């Protein structure tokens, strides 16, 4: 117990009402957040002679100060607890690492509705279907829908400025509502209704309506129309046959848990209208000595209560673990949703199968994660030994990419003890240097990255510079001049020069710009982690450079035409659906673009042709 913190005096001031407490260490950092139905009773339990676990002992030993917030109800306390956990990220709480919002499929409320992926608050008028486990699942579904039900997926800015149909219409993946006369209002509305029913899980209704339309078309001797509808029916059937569907139109989340070697995996299975939309595995940060029950309870609370504004709550949540606050959680979620949410822990029938599936996926994902963790831990330990460091908790690597000195982009990738930390990857557009001067580019990106105060936890132990002696010299010069509050002896700078023929395994490493470097054996775990972070940095830089180059390519041709400034370039590209559409347009079509005269249209036409 802390010698500074007077627990007896503090407990005399604590009420027996429900509320939330925050525990602080000597540095004023929140180290734990908790809730209680009875604050006095709960806080008193921390200062008994026999504590429940080593984790609690370690926590209490660091307490310098406790803040208490009284609430009217337990539900308020539960919501406030998870808001505080998200705000402070206390090291003794179980923390949900990934709290980004889930993507939905959005069907807009426009005259001619469009389909799109949506994340975030649901302000736009229209319908939202989901949630889906990730953006990939949404994009796959949108691509599938485009083949079966060809309604538009273009932005409104493109749709409103079309004068003729785009490529999607030509290949049969859009009905072309942007151009009058290509599709009737009734036909487009019918396809939109099919999409609505399909995304709502009402496949049978879609098939029934399509079959009726096909039969009518056959009776009317409209055989081409009947054949088109037949193909649509077959496509819908192929999709529905591949889906795992329950007998009832279940709308639920299924949560399976696995726990081993101090690491937990929580696998969430998303089921809407009886169909498995997908799933995602989470690996919450678990303080040492934490019981599995606390992991599950905290995860479920954070998962639903912290992200409630961005997440559609299902009617039912299935768990394979009993929660002490199950009723409180269900009541809190019901209050947020404005309808009854059920939390079940002992399902039967199909629900038991779902739970077994989630549990199996959690165990499989945990085995994979532990294997990866073991590999990256071994590699970082080996590299620390090579570099004579006690440990490596964070590494950053830089690379430069350009084409003949144009569109230069620098990348910074970050590894921590668990491997790539992709949320902290960054790209930097480099400007104001001589084209092709990689040294100046490296100098600029390092100053932008490190020429300011950095949180202690984000100061890297090692910085890898891809490029050998010259680039390392730039890095050394930058760090010698930087006026930053942290120690100039940290981080360690390491240059990496590619081997002969740029073959992996032949890299030369440099601690200093002068003198000879050294190499590691091709089978060295230390070399493997260097190659991994170097390749990540290289790929990240190239990806950014290609995006920048593609953007410039779309406008560079127009930039040479007198009278076509940035606003007109943007209008031309939007109205024509891109540079290729503009190249294929006639003078008359170009002249219809707002702000383009007949004379300027002719100039643009001939400039693009020649």
UniProtKB/Swiss-Prot annotation:
Residues 204-239 form the UVR domain. Residues 16-94 form the GIY-YIG domain. GO terms for biological process: nucleotide-excision repair; SOS response. It is found in: Cytoplasm. CDD domains: GIY-YIG_UvrC_Cho. The keyword NADP does not apply. SUPFAM superfamilies: C-terminal UvrC-binding domain of UvrB, GIY-YIG endonuclease, RuvA domain 2-like. InterPro entries: GIY-YIG_endonuc, GIY-YIG_endonuc_sf, GIY-YIG_UvrC_Cho, Hlx-hairpin-Hlx_DNA-bd_motif, RuvA_2-like, UVR_dom, UVR_dom_sf, UvrABC_protein_C. One of its GO terms (cellular component) is excinuclease repair complex. Keywords: Cytoplasm, DNA damage, DNA excision, DNA repair, Excision nuclease, SOS response. One of its GO terms (molecular function) is DNA binding. It holds the Pfam family UvrC_RNaseH. The keyword DNA repair applies. It comes from the Bacteria. HAMAP family: UvrC. The UvrABC repair system catalyzes the recognition and processing of DNA lesions. UvrC both incises the 5' and 3' sides of the lesion. The N-terminal half is responsible for the 3' incision and the C-terminal half is responsible for the 5' incision. Interacts with UvrB in an incision complex. Belongs to the UvrC family. This is UvrABC system protein C.
